[in-house]
Swiss-Prot record:
NCBIfam families: PRK09360.1 (NF006860), PRK12395.1 (NF009061). The gene is lamB2. This is Maltoporin 2. Induction: By maltose. It catalyses: beta-maltose(in) = beta-maltose(out). One of its GO terms (cellular component) is cell outer membrane. Keywords: Cell outer membrane, Ion transport, Membrane, Porin, Signal, Sugar transport, Transmembrane, Transmembrane beta strand, Transport. It is a multi-pass membrane protein. One of its GO terms (molecular function) is porin activity.
Length: 419
């Protein structure tokens, strides 16, 4: 026994002083968090349609992402970088929140290897494999990503071609619990091919990116025999965007088209997930997004997101769905650390069905807040904010107070940070 322990100790010591460990000069620590406390007119904080009316004063969760990364090998132009990230989500209701009873949910979000310096002709191009957030395109004030093909995969990114760079990836994004009538075999494997070209500048101050995502459901033999929802077609999503420097900020225009199982993203504020839960053989959708961040003065800045989307036949019952959403957030910096924030958002969505009926959704949110953060940068974090919000369902959906009210208010304190 003593000999075994001595052998193990020697092995551990040798591992700790090995060249591969000593090569790690620093660990990169990065992440995101939001947390807070608040009340509404009906108990705890209400959260309603935040991707449509805005997130400020309209979030009720505690969420965090903790990432660790390190360059584990470096020789001349060749670099091997390992990255990892875990996430945690809870409702913030108790002191001790564990996985018991789903008080808290933990997830493995990223675990990948990124290699530079091995592609001839471009030492900055990256070969990668593993699980990662893949080039996500974010709309921060409504907490959604309009282009988001993330998951386990592999690819080559940022390979210089002409004035820009090409990225090609294969990413897995399965659909779960599609049809539980097939016992133990209701998850469908879906593979995406993602191709992007970014960096072409047609004029001074501009920047463009275009891409295509091709989703391929890959059912098992049993699922193919069963048919139905498992008999899903391959789908495509096209994205093109152009950004323009403007008054020290920017404005961006995004145009998107999607069909089949990807079409519903155009009216759901989604970023590329495949809908296996509805019949989508004839589905088509379009989306236009305009967003920008403009520092109007040294102390006053404004961020907006305007979304218009339209889709046909996204379910076997739905003829057409139209969506329009507009959210604006203004910020005024009183002192280096004190700011006033206001956010207003509204949306309207109409689903028209093949039987001639329709379903309407719509509403507004108004928020005022006092924030503490180093200014005047609009996105400077960490930030602590005290807020009050009013939320209203203008289409009589009664989403509040146990289905009895069309409106409610929130009051609370929230902190947000990324690093």
């Amino acid at each position: 026994m003593k000999t075994s322990l001595r052998t193990l100790s020697v092995a551990l010591a040798a591992a700790l002083v090995s060249p591969s460990v000593l090569a790690i000069e620093k660990i990169d620590f990065h992440g995101y968090m939001r947390a807070g406390v608040g009340v509404s007119s009906d108990g705890g904080l209400a959260e309603w349609q935040k991707t449509m009316v805005g997130r400020l004063g309209n979030e009720s969760d505690t969420y965090g992402e903790i990432g660790l990364g390190a360059e584990v090998y470096k020789k001349e132009d060749v670099s091997f970088y390992l990255d990892s990230m875990v996430s945690m989500l809870s409702d913030g209701s108790n002191d001790s929140e564990t996985t018991i009873g789903d008080d808290a949910q933990f997830g493995l979000r990223q675990l990948n290897l990124q290699i530079k310096g091995l592609i001839p002709g471009d030492k900055e191009a990256v070969i990668w494999g593993g699980k990662r957030y893949y080039q996500r395109h974010d709309l921060h004030i409504i907490d959604t990503k309009y282009w988001n093909i993330s998951g386990s995969g592999a690819g080559i990114e940022n390979y210089t071609v002409g004035p820009g760079a090409v990225s090609v990836a294969w990413v897995r994004g399965d659909a779960n619990d599609v049809d539980t009538r097939i016992t133990g075999d209701s998850d469908v494997n879906i593979n995406y091919i993602d191709v992007r070209y970014a960096g072409f500048k047609p004029w001074a101050g501009s920047w463009t990116e275009v891409g295509i995502d091709y989703a391929m459901p890959n059912p098992t033999k049993q699922q193919k025999e069963y048919g139905g929802l498992y008999d899903a077609d391959n789908a495509v999503m096209l994205t093109g965007e152009i950004s323009q420097d403007m008054f020290g900020g920017y404005n961006k225009l995004v145009l998107q088209y999607a069909n089949k199982g990807l079409a519903q993203n155009m009216i759901s504020q989604g970023g590329g997930w495949y809908d296996m839960w509805h019949k989508t053989d004839e589905a088509k959708g379009y989306r236009v997004i305009n967003t920008g961040l403009i520092p109007i003065t040294d102390k006053f800045s404004f961020n907006h997101v305007l979304t218009w989307g339209s889709a046909n036949d996204i379910t076997e019952y739905t003829d057409k769905t139209n969506l329009i959403s507009l959210v604006g957030r203004a910020q005024y910096q009183f002192t280096q650390y004190v700011r006033a924030i206001g956010e207003v958002g509204g949306f309207y969505q109409k689903d028209t069905y093949h039987n001639g009926s329709n379903y309407k959704q719509g509403g507004e949110k108004y928020t005022i807040a006092l924030g503490l953060a180093e200014g005047p940068d609009f996105l400077s974090r960490p930030e602590l904010r005290v807020f009050a919000s009013y939320l209203n369902d203008s289409e009589n959906g009664k989403p509040f107070e146990d289905g009895t009210s069309n409106d409610t208010w929130n009051f609370g304190v929230q902190v947000e940070a990324w690093w």
